[in-house]
Amino acid sequence: MNGDELPFESGFEVYAKGTHKSEFDSNLLDPRSDPIWDAIREEAKLEAEKEPILSSFLYAGILAHDCLEQALGFVLANRLQNPTLLATQLLDIFYGVMMHDKGIQSSIRHDLQAFKDRDPACLSYSSAILHLKGYHALQAYRVAHKLWNEGRKLLALALQSRISEVFGIDIHPAARIGEGILLDHGTGVVIGETAVIGNGVSILHGVTLGGTGKETGDRHPKIGEGALLGACVTILGNISIGAGAMVAAGSLVLKDVPSHSVVAGNPAKLIRVMEEQDPSLAMKHDATKEFFRHVADGYKGAQSNGPSLSAGDTEKGHTNSTS
């Protein structure tokens, strides 16, 4: 046993099946120069020392693996397995995508940093990998999206179904989602087939990015970079939420929202221009209170006379995103 090895490590087999360090190809980020992976391993070792009862759990989920992709694939495979979609099969799927796609490798890390920076309940990188279903669902979606784009649509839809069953988060594999995304809690989030989400967006629980129920083709919302969607927001139709906009909790949005603006209500009304350039990073959720003060202070005709969200108010360019 060397100086860096914990006492329990020599007593467990390596749980990760499939790819080993010697088999990494040139597409994989070098695990020897990955500061996030280094931090994750250090966190896991410290937690194992503090809580010995979890030592085998931490070893199996993190310390047995050579890189972040291996560890994440192992965790996702064990979370999503069922009697007809085995963990070993899922490991092959996740490794086959994550070990060879630099775009997904980048997104995995940017998303992880977003959870660590913006979610006060996320105590560490390792806690996101091991415990946070919003992170799990997002990374499993990324694999399903890759499969969808490769024409393996039945397998992608099977993954979508398992993600929805296990995590309560329904993301169509054809949706296009950027990186640096936070799905805080994640419960009840629904993202439709033609939705587009830009980089750096924060999404709270219960958010729906849906169609109107009657259209086909491009029918779902487009969310600009750095936007913040509060809890239980519903956005319907092929409309744009501008970059850096904030949609307050409980709002129903049916029209375009200007960039760097705050909207709230049912239907949503324009409240003010954002002071913060990146509300998704600030994670301030006070716009709903502002809206009700706005109503209580005498704007009885807000629905008919208040500033409306017309197409002319919006910057029409759709958001940059990764596919």
From Swiss-Prot:
Residues 302-323 are annotated as: Disordered. CDD domains: LbH_SAT. GO terms for biological process: cysteine biosynthetic process from serine; sulfate assimilation. Homomultimer. It comes from Arabidopsis thaliana (Mouse-ear cress). It catalyses: L-serine + acetyl-CoA = O-acetyl-L-serine + CoA. Keywords: Acyltransferase, Amino-acid biosynthesis, Cytoplasm, Transferase. Belongs to the transferase hexapeptide repeat family. Pfam families: Hexapep, SATase_N. SUPFAM superfamilies: Trimeric LpxA-like enzymes (SSF51161). Ubiquitously expressed at low levels. Localized in vascular tissues, particularly in phloem. It is an enzyme of class 2 (transferase). Pathway: Amino-acid biosynthesis; L-cysteine biosynthesis; L-cysteine from L-serine: step 1/2. One of its GO terms (molecular function) is serine O-acetyltransferase activity. GO terms for cellular component: cytosol. Induction: By cadmium (Cd). Induced in roots under sulfur-deficient conditions. SMART domains: SATase_N. Its EC number is 2.3.1.30. Residues 313-323 have a biased composition (Basic and acidic residues). It is found in: Cytoplasm. This is Serine acetyltransferase 2.
